[in-house]
Each structure stands twice: as C-alpha cells, then as structure tokens.
Amino acid sequence: MLSFNNTTSASSFQSASSRYLMSSSSSIGPPQQQSAKLFPEHFYPSGLSPRQSEALERLRPNTASRERNIPIQFTGKNPTTNSALEEYKPVPHVQVTSPKSSIVPNFVSEQRGLQPQPTSQAPTNYRQFVAAPRSPRGYGDYPEMTGKASAAGDSEPVQIPIKTQTPITQARAQETKIPTIVSPHPVYYYDNQEQPIQQIREEQPNATMETKVTGQGQPKRVGRWTLAQLRQTDGIIPSQAGWNKGDSQKLMTNFGTPRNTNTRVKSENLQEIPEDIANRTHGEVRLQSGTNKYCSQRGMTGFGSGRDVCREGVRVAQNPADLAELPEEKIRMSEGIVRLQAGTNKYDSQKGMTGFGTGRRETTKMVDSKHPEYDHEKPDQSEIPLQSGTNKFASQKGMTGFGTARRETTKMVDSNHPDYSHECSIDQTTIPSQMGSNQYASQKGMTGFGQPRWEVLDPSISWQNRKSQGMVRLQSGTNRFASQAGMIGFGTCRNTTFEAEGGELPYEAMKVSETIIPSQAGWNKGDSQKKMTSFGAPRDVKGKHLKRIWELEYPEEAEISLDRL
C-alpha cells in the first residue's frame, strides 16, 4: 500500500523539488553537471509499474479532474534541414500536461522509458484499463467555492502524437534515446517549468493502491516480477533425490501398492541422471526377507489373515512385468512355519457367530497320545477330560434372571453317600451334609435389597431333610414379622421393637439398662437438629445441662417431673 502524508507544507515541497532537478530543459548536459542528490541512491527508484504510477498520480491534490493519459512532448526546436538535423541533439523530456502543478515527481516508467522498447500490444487506454477507476471529486472542489467551472464534463486531454514522417538516420535514433540510468531503483525527473505550487492546500485522504488483473497480452505480475521470472526459480531437486512430478496414485486402491513410474529427475537446467545411478537410491530387500510385490489382500476379510503368495526381490518400485518368474522353492522360503504342537486355523471362519465366545464350527483337532480312543471325526472336537464336567448340551434359553441356574447341571457323585440316586433326584445340585439345603427356598416377593428369607438356614438339619426351617438362636432376636413398608427415609427405625417379658420392672432396674451419660456430657434425648443448616454446627449441650441443674434445685418450677428425666 502506498500512502503519502499530504500535510507537509507546499513550500517544503517546492524547495525540495528544486534540488532534485535531474532531467529538464535547463539541466541538459553531462551527468557531472547535474545537481547533487539530497538522499541516498535507494531513495530514487529506477522505474514504476503502471499500478504504482496510477497510485502516485492520484495523490495529487488537484482542483480539476485528474488526468489518466500523460502525453509525451519533446521540448526544443524541430529541425527543418539535414544540416540542422545533425546539430540537433536534444534529450527527450517527459512532461505531464496537467492543469495544476504536482508534488509528485515526473517519472519514466519501466514499460516505455529507460530502454528502447518495441511497440506495445496493449490498448491505448492501458493505464485506465489496469489501474483503479477514477477517484471521486476532491474535497472542496465545487464551483460555488472555487469560482471556476466544474471540470467534470471536460474532455480528455489531447494526446500529441510524435511525428515520424521525417527520415531519421541511425545516428539520430541513437541520439534520441533516453539515457540509461544504471540504478536498481526508479529515478524521478522533476520539471522546474511547472506552475508554482499552490500555497494553501486542503487535506486529502491517503491514496491506496488497488490490485487489478492485467489485460490479455501483458505478462501477469506478482509484485515487480512476472510469473515467468518467478518460475525460473522453482525448487531444484538435488541429484541424490528422485522426482515425483508426474507420478500419480490414480487407481491405487490397495494400501502400499508400489507405483509403476520410476523415479527420475527431469529439469531444464539439470543434467539427466543415468539409470544405474538413479537406481542406487531404491530400497534394497535382503535375501532373508521376502517381497509382497504380487501379494494382494483382496477378499481378505479377517484380521491377520495370511497371504497365499510370498515372493522376494532385490529392488522395489519396478514394473512387475519386468521381473522374471521365481521358482517355487524361493517362493516358499518365507512362508510361516507352523510347529507340530500347534494347530492351524487356515480355513476357519467366524461367519454366523453372533454370541460372544461362541465356538467355531471347525476347531483344532487335538492328538492326545494318552487317549488314543478319541475319534476326531466327531462333529465336536472339543473333548473335555474326565476330571471336569461338560456343558455340551447346556443352554441358557429362557434364562432371563441373572444367576439363574441351568436346567441341566453337572451331576455330582458323592462317595460318602452312595445311597443317593441321581436318577430319582429332581434337583441335581445336592448339597453335602455339612450344609443346609435351599431347595425349596424362594425369593418371591422379596423386593428389598438384602431382605432375609423366611426360612433361615440351620446347619444342624440333616442333608436328607429338604425342608428349610428358620431356627433362631437364643442370643439374637427375630425379625420374622418385621417389615420395611412405609420406610422412605434412610436409617428409619422399625416399628417393631424389643419387648421384655415378665411384666413391669422396678424404676431402679430400668435405670440400670439405660445409657449412662457421664457428667461432662449433656443429654440428647429430646434434642433435634431442626434449623441446623450449617455443617458441623455444635449442639446446645451446655444449655441443656444448665437447665437440668436448675430443675434439680427448683423442682417446683420445673415443667416436667424429675422421674421422666
């Protein structure tokens, strides 16, 4: 973005412009006679692009309409004769014909200035076509304030063509060239014959460069460089690396499929690498490992399924058609060796296996030298040894409850009770004599968690007696008819409490079994935590203790009797 501070006084610009006289009618002469430059060389650029020139033109605070076309005029007398032609050696001077003097220096653009350029194919209104559109009317540019006619309807300035009918010799063509200025930056040309700069100028908004796409026929630019110039500096790949400029993975559906294009370096400014040198960078596969050049996972749906083809090679990234056929001995070298102690699941499948842990239809055949009577042609090869039971025909069909026993359970043989018949027993889960039986026990109606059964186990009952009897010992009470119905609070006491049989006890005997509270602590019999909102709020134990002492001293004023304390 280009911007200028227009608040600088006009007098400073006028004094500065007189110091920058580099090419004018009064300063034509040898380069040694030109005035010295005030700033270093890098402050004077050697050329501007059309966009930059248009942005500089828009910075002029003109009161009239700003011009877009800059006619070129030659200052000096025109030669009439051949003798005068030889003596006439002027330097062309670029003069901007604008109605107002400009603080922006006149310049020679890089398209038509410093070097003789061929005839441009751009349209005549190239600068209007490339640069930004016309700027709006300047601040205060109104006929009522300036007293001048508005320039909005004025026509464009007439471009004065350069007459070329006069025969120009080769010497004249060399003399009329604009002298080349060897400088990496644009050079400004100031004209000292312009009108005096207006002393009073109003503040103008800063101009902003707008980027436009150039027309056809002109090279596209990125900054001050063309795309053709930028492409000359494309990344050069060294000889030790390959080039994948034209490679493609189109139609490569398998993971890790090698490319069929060999890696080569192709560049205009690099010498082509021989094939033997380029192949040195290819990864070499040692003889102890195979190659998966022709392997495919097509149709391999199971995880970890082995491939049926295994090859080995020396190089990779070669055309498969160039490889010679390998003998079967080499192909079989890298196959997995299966030991004798392990089976094979080559043709196994889990198709249709919906249950977790469901056995396969085809299982590994086990050869047991200790049990030669095993027949491996049986449908189910999962033979279970004699020391454990079998769940071959067991089923959980219809088992909706968690932990529900199966219909078919393991038959237990008890050597201590040979009279027990497994064929006559309804329930095969026979419990030995050291334990009770829960054969007829039921949890029907037990909705509470941890609620005891109606029949409590009694170890003293013989195992033949299948009836469960709830025998309660003397040291504990019974909760047979206890119920938690209506108990909605956590830890709520039951409505059935212990009762002592034998009638009323004396007052002294009742006090013996009560909780004895030491003297340093109070009594919390009737205490309540109502309105206790804060965590850890202490109880009013001290107040209770003082109240009790007062009631002991003044029993006539106590609210309750001392016997009820």
From Swiss-Prot:
Pfam families registered for this protein in UniProt: Calponin
Biased composition (Basic and acidic residues): 54-69, 369-381
Keyword Cytoplasm annotated: yes
Subcellular location: Cytoplasm, Myofibril, Sarcomere, I band
Signal peptide interval: none
InterPro entries xref list: Calponin-like (IPR050606), Calponin_repeat (IPR000557)
Domain notes: Calponin-like repeats 1-3 are required for actin binding and acting bundling activity.
Protein's recorded name: Protein unc-87
